[in-house]
Amino acid sequence: MQTIRHTHLKLLPGILATLLLSACSMGKMVVQGTESVMDSSVETMNRETDLELAREAMPANLKLIEGMLIEDPGNTFMRLYAAEGFYGYAFGFIELEDRERASQFYRRCYDHALRALQDTGIQANPETSSPAELEATVGKAGAKSVAALFWTASCLGKWIDLNRDEPTGIIEISSAAIMMQRVLELDDDFYYGGAHMFFGVYYGGRAPMFGGDHALAEEHFRKAAAINQDRLLLVDLLQAEYLDRQRLDQAGFNKRLTRIVEAPDDLYPEMALINGITKQRAHHLLTLEDDWF
């Protein structure tokens, strides 16, 4: 009897380990099984026309994604949705009213995106690598790393934009540009031509003596508009806010923002949410016109 009891005791750790492994595997299976649902959820959110409904829904969605990442921390797909979600929530609903909080969300966005990038095999660290080191590292990136490169660069760029007094900002924005340049090389129309919008802001938001290139910025905005058949209002918003303001082109600033405000709500049904957010921000920028010009 004692021998049987000892045998059971010896088996117990193995049984417990098996149960724990099964639980972990089950958690991962559940997460991976929701990936197609997440695709549909994001598509539905992008089509949302009620900004208040979207604002109230997004925090719960983000926490759900982060909960799934606890179950499956190596899930690159979910990492990228977390990055995209935090970026969208910060840009769409937080930045104009609380820049510090938005900055924290962009940082979380960056952390998720960088982890996703490293999980694709690109062991980059944009904040510590020299430009030459980073360029060599991202030069190895292929198509599977495009999304992670894009969101890492985008989130880092927005974090820098809200923390311009940070001494490392100039170095880090060049790191974001190196990553985004690789996105341009691999797939320049990825995420609605987002890389072109990035470089429109990058070259358009600075005076030429500080590295700006307004002609190049205008070309990038033109390409982004063409990719979206002039239906994504965000392109005009960014051109007005950064390039027109930097060039002191009040007429262009007003014309672009007025076009946004007057655009029909059904201009781009697949991207109704971002167009609605863009309209809201355009109204805000128009209130600043007299101060800026």
Task: Please report, for each region that a protein language model flagged, where it lies by residue.
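Extracytoplasmic and endomembrane cell-envelope/extracellular-matrix remodeling and assembly machinery
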Residues: H283, T287-F293
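Conserved catalytic/binding loops enriched for acidic/polar residues
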Residues: A82
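C-terminal motif of bacterial Sec signal peptides marking the signal peptidase cleavage site
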Residues: S22-A23
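Conserved small-residue-rich beta-alpha loop and adjacent elements
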Residues: Y191
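Short, conserved catalytic or interaction motifs in soluble domains
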Residues: M26
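Short coil/linker segments at helix-helix boundaries
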Residues: S36-L64, E71-G74, G85-E185, G194-N228, ...
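Residue-level signal for mature regions of secreted extracellular proteins and peptides
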Residues: A17-T18
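Bacterial N-terminal signal peptides that target proteins for export
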Residues: Q2-P13
